[in-house]
Amino acid sequence: MFRHGVRTFATTSLRRMAAVAPQEPSQYLLNVSKAQGIAKGLTGAIGNTPLIRLNRLSEETGCEILGKAEFMNPGGSVKDRAALYVVKDAEERGLLRPGGTVVEGTAGNTGIGLAHVCRSKGYKLVIYMPNTQSQGKIDLLRLLGAEVYPVPAVAFENPENYNHQARRHAERLDNAVWTNQFDNIANRRAHIETTGPEIWAQTGGKVDAFTCATGTGGTFAGTTRYLKEVSGGRVKAFLADPPGSVLHSYFSSGGKLIERSGSSITEGIGQGRITDNLKQDVDLVDGSMTISDEKTIEMVYRCLDEEGLYLGASSTLNVVAAKEVAEKLGKGSTVVTMLCDGAYRYADRLFSRKWLEQKNLLGAIPEHLQKYIVLP
């Protein structure tokens, strides 16, 4: 009798909790919402990523510094959004039919995102990339089902650039499309329709500035466009740039493309031209800044130590930019940035003493954080 009573009570309690779960926190303080229901395949799980408060930096600046956790996308990065949209765009325009082939020139996360999306939709994927990329990256893309062609790394203006080779490959095939991530504005549309609205909803419209770096231009331009329009221009937009990129000099010089030498430890960001994704929204940029590799690598270690966030260098460059924008705007401001991906694909470099010494970056990491340098 006693056991039966306990069972009845437990069943009744669980049913009551299930009934209220979509509306309020459970007894374990986990916010369970209808949005976290069953995704319709892999593509249904792309987007709707959390916005994480970076506690230590928020306390330091007296602002709310928030990072969009794009590493939680199924392919592990913000590029899943663009990958899905460029494929959907090709489908909608009749350029890609069942059993077709997607071709792209990419050296990083866009290829991984496309590999996941193409596998889930039944398309073949062909990737052209510079032969300077690691064997591990090539192996990963092949593991995900892609056909990979590493080609000599040459400037965009050279007809043998990996992007142009990808275009020509697609032209030779029937039922194939070159998704052209840099100049295909479906990339930008992904962020106008998903990232921007998510940020606005998650902050309840209480956002003062958005900042991130850009490679294709899609994330920065699309998110900026939405936030500017929905706020009536109130939200400020600041572009962050790694060393060697021309974008900061372009905006700070009033529109002059000035060649810059040098390189950065970051991957997938920085640019030598104004892409079509960025071109439409250059007038929306309120300011720009160059973030040094020294600041970026220090923030890799700070985010791990202080926030428990294991982030890649492009993500921590964005975090540094968000901190600088917060300091510029003053206490009480809310600044949002993108946590593009995690450090999992870069650990053999970012946490290697030998690599840090080769890049002259070991001294940029405070001594108390060097305990995380666990690789030789």
Curated annotation (Swiss-Prot):
Protein name: Cysteine synthase 1
GO BP term, example: cysteine biosynthetic process from serine
Pathway(s) annotated for this protein in UniProt: Amino-acid biosynthesis; L-cysteine biosynthesis; L-cysteine from L-serine: step 2/2
GO cellular component labels: cytoplasm; mitochondrion
Protein source organism: Neurospora crassa (strain ATCC 24698 / 74-OR23-1A / CBS 708.71 / DSM 1257 / FGSC 987)
Subcellular localization(s) per the UniProt record: Mitochondrion
Catalytic activity: O-succinyl-L-serine + hydrogen sulfide = L-cysteine + succinate; O-acetyl-L-serine + hydrogen sulfide = L-cysteine + acetate
Any one Gene Ontology molecular-function term assigned to this protein's record: cysteine synthase activity
Assigned protein family: Belongs to the cysteine synthase/cystathionine beta-synthase family.
Modified residues (N6-(pyridoxal phosphate)lysine): 79
SUPFAM superfamilies the UniProt entry points to: Tryptophan synthase beta subunit-like PLP-dependent enzymes
